[in-house]
């Protein structure tokens, strides 16, 4: 993989011009992407490459539900074939202001739903890269790009990061702007980042969010709660072994680890995530459903069909459950610095018929808290664990994740 921090260091010391860094990304995409299908289209060759700015020389992949004025934005659907926004999304404008080059639109499932894209997992093309941010995770994993944007409504950043073996963060809700991002669920949709290491995504997030404290170090002896989320079902043996390995690595790095069983309000909140999501999706995609229902892919079409039966009372009750769980989570974090749990049920499923299961992600998306995927090194397809911190404490989540990543690397 290509490190954002390494590129920036080489640009800073004068050994790598920013234009050469962007040219190198174009060359890697041309060489590697035909076998992976992560990239949908590239910015024009004539695009300006800034020589200055804290992210100068950084080529960024932009999930194709995020508007770009210089490239078509099709939302993964033929309904929007060739559609060209008049303006960049706010997050894209921010990247340009920092000197980065939004170089490529990355593959997404249609409207960031569950119907798979054509992208394959660069670790093994016989397996899914996950979704819905399929292309962003795959492009970083394949070493084509040092940074990519994704979005998460259920598990669409953390799960593909785990399947592809890259670092990623789903930040606190609304830390990054969603203006210009196609809405699926306005109470859940969150822009996230993929990178080669936790340090890379921490640096990028600190700059994009204008919060330097995000790169602050972790407490000397962070308190970690090891959580299995039993109400979500069982992870497989490999995922549980990776979680145990990460916990022991954290202890060697100085963390204090104890087990945590989440109380009943969290099980109820987990259960109502689909109600919040689908009630809002029914409205967010109302035009597409009314005018182009038959052009919608089958899983999304069925999801929206079922969502027509949801009532405002169902939605309001679900939101109340979520609010109760958020209050209790705030109290829980008085005694712990971070929660450690699995990122996915297991390794990436075989074939491209499914993007995997978000069961271990969706509670934390509903809670709006920061989640970081930490790859766990090993043989075979990648596995990951997620580090979760209190709302607004993205820096702590990243610092703890960085400590675990380092401890695993020293094994």
Label the predicted regions.
Residues 1-84, 112-113, 348:
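Short, well-ordered alpha-helical
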Residues 18-22, 238-261, 286-291, 315, ...:
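Acyltransferase
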Residues 69-72, 207-272:
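Gly/Ser-rich, acidic/histidine-flanked active-site/gating loops
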Residues 87-205, 370-377, 382-384:
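Short glycine/serine-rich loop segments
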